[in-house]
Amino acid sequence: MKIGIIGATGYGGAEIMRIMRTHPYADECILYSSSDEGARYDAAYPHLVKLTDQHLQPIEVKRIANEIDFLFMAAPPGISSRLTPQFDAYDIPIIDLSGDLRIQNPSVYEKWYKREAAPEHVLQKAVYGLSELNREDIKTAQYIANPGCFPTAVLLGLAPLVKSGSINESFVIIDAKTGVSGAGRKPSMGTHFSEVNDNFKIYKVNEHQHTPEIEQTVKQWNSAFKPITFSTHLVPMTRGIMATIYTELKDSMDAEQLQLIFSKFYKDSYFVRVRETGSFPATKEVYGSNFCDIGVTVDERTNRVTIVSVIDNLMKGAAGQAVQNFNIMNGLSETAGLEFTPIYP
């Protein structure tokens, strides 16, 4: 199968390239870029010297459609909403890693992303690619809206209790931390080494664009849920997300009962690892892998639950989940090309 990657010079695109280089069902990866067309790919990423000698190709829709079988879009927001409608006539399956296809209501997208939404007919065709929860819809989809990094960690952490009706629909607080690669490769003052090193800061308070994505999905599972409280923090590390989620049980249960709910819920999900009671994950334990590790407990004094969910933001939070969705769409094993051991230490 010939694979195309638009936005190959960004971190998400580079991570897809890393995975698909050795994927058993990818015969060739063709790389496209609007900013560096014609350049050697290993000039943008010297760690790929001797691993690829490809040049970056221009983004020309008709040409791309004629030379690939499957397309990953790893470009910044605003690109996919413009390009995806142009591929409609070619019946090319697409996985989009930006937020352009995730929000079903165009006015909600425009409020949070501050840009024009994709055409409604494209949004209606897009399936939300939370692999463990939407497998059946993903199998037959033409367009996949790959989930954001924070929503992936948060929603995998919340799903067992939301879907079982176990928690108070008015009480969900999410305190999330991310490494700097989540901001992308383009330099900025906020992610400059001197600004990030030895520092820890909150950002986009009450304004993070992943808020409506989380709320939209939770309300699809249970329409009674009220708006959530969601805060994000930047920590001085390259990769990783930790989402600490606080919620309240409707009925009393102990930590062992909670752990059993999570273990049963994810028993057929290879990439979700539920910790034993009393054990909680760290970001280093999923680094470079497609795993999501989850720990859960309850404070029996307050009947409030703490869920800790960790992922590698570039893998399970982006490229890894995109390839997992590629596998599902093509009837392959979900683990094909993704059985990376986490890098430790």
UniProtKB/Swiss-Prot annotation:
Group of enzyme by EC: oxidoreductase
GO cellular component terms, A-Z: cytoplasm
GO annotation terms (biological process): L-arginine biosynthetic process
Cellular localisation: Cytoplasm
Pfam families: Semialdhyde_dh (PF01118), Semialdhyde_dhC_1 (PF22698)
Catalytic reaction equation(s): N-acetyl-L-glutamate 5-semialdehyde + phosphate + NADP(+) = N-acetyl-L-glutamyl 5-phosphate + NADPH + H(+)
Signal peptide: none
NCBIfam families according to UniProt: argC (TIGR01850)
UniProt record similarity statement: Belongs to the NAGSA dehydrogenase family. Type 1 subfamily.
Protein name per its UniProtKB record: N-acetyl-gamma-glutamyl-phosphate reductase
Annotated source species: Bacillus licheniformis (strain ATCC 14580 / DSM 13 / JCM 2505 / CCUG 7422 / NBRC 12200 / NCIMB 9375 / NCTC 10341 / NRRL NRS-1264 / Gibson 46)
The encoding gene: argC
